[in-house]
């Protein structure tokens, strides 16, 4: 079994830059990090695994269905904009209780973190943009196949297109993680955390922050 640790749900606020003591300017992503509220504690005895379920933000009551409303009411927690789970070690479960809050204190400046988000959706795209295919000649007798993908396979044998063939299709809007980003600054008063570099998704998208799994 792998080593699990508590994570945090934030919202991408945008990008900026920070000047270091030596005068160097580095790009950072600002993440809005309001307190996460614990909704449920899952244990291996009851649920088959150990995890902490959290929510964040708020949602209008008309947008919360009956099962969710009952789930939040049982925990005596305000309905948030979603539910997320973080696997933790069994020995860590005692540090959390239903209704308590998880703050930025679980991270420190200089720490390496992994961040997961949903990439920007690009809609239906061709093979050149989606898979970095090479374009055909612009001239020299080519008048039909400037951006065509080319051959999709062979003839009667095998008589089919192999699964996984790179073709046109929907691009983006998938779950993606970036690893080993350094925490540059934590602003507890303004509920912001700045990490070095870029993270997946558009501004306003929810992201999951965890301690780096590979260092």
Curated annotation (Swiss-Prot):
Keyword vocabulary terms for this entry: Methylation, Ribonucleoprotein, Ribosomal protein, RNA-binding, rRNA-binding
Pfam family, one: Ribosomal_L3
Key word Ribonucleoprotein present: yes
GO process terms (BP): translation
SUPFAM superfamilies listed in its UniProt record: Translation proteins (SSF50447)
NCBIfam families per the UniProt record, alphabetical: L3_bact
Record-given protein name: Large ribosomal subunit protein uL3
Species annotation: Xylella fastidiosa (strain Temecula1 / ATCC 700964)
Gene: rplC
């Amino acid at each position: 079994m792998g080593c699990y640790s508590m994570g945090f749900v934030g919202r991408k606020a945008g990008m900026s830059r920070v000047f270091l003591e030596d005068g160097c300017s580095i790009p950072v992503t600002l993440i809005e990090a309001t307190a996460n509220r614990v909704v449920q504690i899952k244990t291996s005895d009851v649920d088959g695994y150990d995890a902490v379920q959290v929510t964040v933000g708020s949602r209008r009551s008309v947008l919360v269905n009956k099962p969710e409303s009952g789930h939040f009411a049982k925990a005596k927690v305000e309905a948030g904009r979603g539910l997320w789970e973080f696997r933790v070690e069994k020995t860590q479960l005692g540090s959390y209780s239903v209704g308590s809050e998880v703050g930025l204190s679980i991270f420190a400046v200089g720490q390496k973190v992994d961040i997961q988000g949903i990439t920007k959706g690009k809609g239906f795209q061709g093979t050149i943009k989606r898979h970095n295919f090479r374009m055909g000649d612009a001239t020299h007798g080519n008048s039909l196949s400037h951006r065509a993908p080319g051959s999709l396979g062979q003839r009667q044998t095998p008589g089919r297109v192999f699964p996984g063939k790179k073709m046109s299709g929907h691009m983006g809007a998938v779950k993606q993680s970036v690893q080993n980003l350094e925490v540059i600054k934590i602003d507890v008063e303004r509920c912001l955390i700045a990490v070095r570099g870029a993270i997946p998704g558009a501004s306003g998208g929810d992201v999951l922050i965890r301690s780096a799994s590979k260092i």
